[in-house]
A protein has these predicted regions:
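Class I S-adenosyl-L-methionine-dependent methyltransferase catalytic core
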Residues: 1-147
Length: 147
């Protein structure tokens, strides 16, 4: 887990909470578990939530020592319907290295070309309300938010 950073307004999501947030998005239909798609992580930080989305919704595995996508899962990672946004250039670089698609740097100025079926987020505490309102704006009708 990454260390909190007050200057960045960054407080990492514990792995167990990230798992619970993403797992709660699942839908069981006719005995099959599916996840809504596409999914947005608008304040991706160190990738804790994004890694859980990759693992649960897209069966993409990351090496827990390096964070990088398992060599056998690189193609699945590229095709995963998961978009990440991150303000910190350092975190963006790590997310890209770890196999995530980073589509923008500032969620509040993001103008998506599609609406999202699910949004999982741990927004900066100082801008939590603005991030939640923006999430409602970029979510599909009937979509799901986990915050």
């Amino acid at each position: 887990m990454t260390t909190p950073n007050d200057a960045l307004d960054f407080y990492p999501t514990p792995d167990s909470l990230a798992f619970d947030m993403v797992f709660s998005l699942r839908e069981v239909k006719s005995g099959f578990t599916t996840y809504p798609k596409p999914i947005l992580e608008p304040s991706a930080g160190d990738g804790a939530l994004a890694r859980q989305v990759h693992a649960l919704a897209f069966n993409v595995h990351h090496d827990y020592k390096t964070g990088e996508v398992d060599r056998y899962d690189k193609e699945k990672a590229r095709s995963a319907e998961l978009d990440c946004i991150e303000l910190s250039s350092d975190f963006r670089a790590v997310l890209k290295k770890d196999g995530f698609r980073v589509v923008h740097d500032n969620f509040l100025t993001f103008r998506p070309t599609t609406k999202y079926a699910a949004i999982v987020m741990n927004p900066p505490f100082s801008a939590g309300a603005a991030h939640l309102l923006k999430a409602l704006d970029v979510m599909q009708d009937g979509g799901k938010i986990r915050c």
